[in-house]
Each structure stands twice: as C-alpha cells, then as structure tokens.
Amino acid sequence: MSAPAPAHRRIARTLAAATLLAASALVVAQAPPAVAATSQFKGVNWADTRDNYNSGWVIPDGLAASDSYSQVYSIADSYTKAFVNNLGANTLRLPINPPSVSQSWWGAYKGAIDAALHNNMKVIIGAWTESSSVGTITDMTAWQNMWSTVVSAYGGNGNVYFEPLNEPYGYSSSQWISIASSWLSAFSSVPRGRVIIAGTGYDDHVGDEGASSALSGTLLSLHMYGTWASSTTESAWVSNLNSRLGGYASRTVITEFGGPMTTGINYLTNHNNGQYQSFVAAVTDTARSDGFGTVYWAGLKTGDNYSMEAHNGSGLSNTNSSGVTQIRWGWGY
C-alpha cells in the first residue's frame, strides 16, 4: 500500500549514484528467456503487518525474525498451498529491502521464495524503500548490493521476476527511467521479460515507461486503488484505468489493487452503484478482457481489511467469498 506523498529529497545524490550503478560489472548466472505473458500472473501480495515500508527487515505476516530457513520454508509452504488451493493463485509478490538482504534474515527469508517456487508459483521479488525515505532510494550502494545478491541467487530461475523499486514516487518519470535503465544495464543477464518496472509515482501510470526505448522488452507495474477516486460506476473506473495503462496493457501487470474484504461487502453486486464494487469489477473485467495479469493486495496482511486471507490454525481461510469469486474472474477462471 502507498505511504502519504512526501517531499522530494536526495534526488541529485541518488541520480549520481545511478551513473555508477550503470557502470558496475556484476556477474550473474545467465537466465533462460521469459515465456510468461502478463495474463499468466494470477497473484497475491504477502505483506509485512507493519507495512512493507520498513527501516529494518521486512517480515511477511506469520513469519518471525527468529525463524530459521526451515521454519520459514515450512510456514511459506503452508501459506502458498493455501493461496493456490483457496484462491487459484499462481504468483506470489514478496518484499525486500537492503537490510533484509544484507543481514542474517536473508538466509532464512529465502525459504519463503524457495517454498513458493517448489509449489510451482511465480515469484515477484519487489524492492521497497526504507521507511525513512521519501520514494527515493535511501542508499544507492546498498540497493545495488541487495540486487546483486538477489539476482545471483535467483537470476537463473525462470519463475522469478525482479521489480527494482516499488512506487518510486520521489522521482520524476525521466529520473526514474534513468535509474531503471541503469538497473537493466547492471543486470543485463536477466531477460528483460523477467523485469517489472514500476510506473511513475505510486506506480500509478505506465505510459512514460512504456514509451521509453530504454525500457523496451520489460514488463510494467501498475498500482490502482478504489480510494483514488470517488466513482461509483464501472465505466468510470474503466476509463480511469485505461488512462493509467496508456495503451501498454499487453506489458502491464497490476501488482497492487484491492478493496475491503473483511467488512461484508458483496463484490458480485452494485457494479454500477458502489465505489469499491465498481472499482474491483472494473479492474477484474478489464484484466480478463484485455488479457493482463493482476496481483491482489493483500493476499495476507493481518490488520488490513483488504486481506483476502486470514489465519486459521496453521493454515489460511478466505475472508470474503464474493471477493474471491470476483478476483478469480479477473484471472480467467
């Protein structure tokens, strides 16, 4: 989810460091070509209950900082099976940040990625800024080192996708495109079809990124929420969504969208007379008709009424059957 829009800071320092990143010679395993079209992404976000913007480790709901690799793997295995069986999901989006990868948590946290892969899920590894930042990369060297570690570990796995930065809202589109293209140069052995580039701002428009030749061949990440307008008709939300896609639906994955799931809303009604119902209907109907993938926020995040799943013993259960039906409709079921 998005943090409140902050003032821009550290842009000049970050852009200067991006130049160094582009010149870096990072050696990673040659990965196979990507084969997935965006309609194949039927996903959920597994989020930290504190939110993924964090100055320390990001720890998805249900995991603990003291967990070992085997403990993380076991929990993630149970949860990913629930995402598959309860929802029909085949994609899991997981957060990282520099402390999570540079410190001891990474050794355990890899268990979540590995368990999802073992269950034949695609995994989107997305980088969040730290909580003290303002939509810009806090420390470019740490960000570069984080991605070097992650790509070295998973660059050779065709089911892992890399999202260099979530919601780069502290940059203009041209600044962000420069940084993203630097990432592509630094990690050139990763097929571009397995790199998901955030849209401008809060991932809220992808037109500039889609039009950039520097980012050609990449996938694009779009976020959209029903709180971003007060529309109550599906047609109004469809128009809003299409303006954000900018003609690049074929390359776009909506990596965040959602609505309240624990408040009793029936998502199978009021598609033309309800703010959240019409919003979710617009996204899912358009995804189905236009053939692009979606990753729901959140699949699991206790305390967030958007959460599609809730803890139930050692497993998970659905929080809103109508919401599940509507999300699955968008996935082509």
Give, region by region, the residue ranges found by the protein language model.
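Bacterial N-terminal signal peptides that target proteins for export
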Residues: 3-17
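N-terminal carbohydrate-binding accessory modules
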Residues: 14, 22, 31-91
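Juxtamembrane cytosolic interface motif at the C-terminal end of transmembrane helices
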Residues: 27-29
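Short amphipathic alpha-helices and their capping/turn segments at secondary-structure boundaries
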Residues: 33-36, 79-85, 112-114, 207-210, ...
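Feature marks short, surface-exposed loop/turn motifs that line or immediately flank catalytic pockets
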Residues: 48-52, 98-100, 131, 168, ...
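Extracellular glycoside hydrolase catalytic/binding regions
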Residues: 58-73, 141-161, 165-293, 297-301, ...
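Aromatic-lined substrate-binding rim segments of carbohydrate-active enzymes
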Residues: 76-131, 142-143, 184-192, 272-290
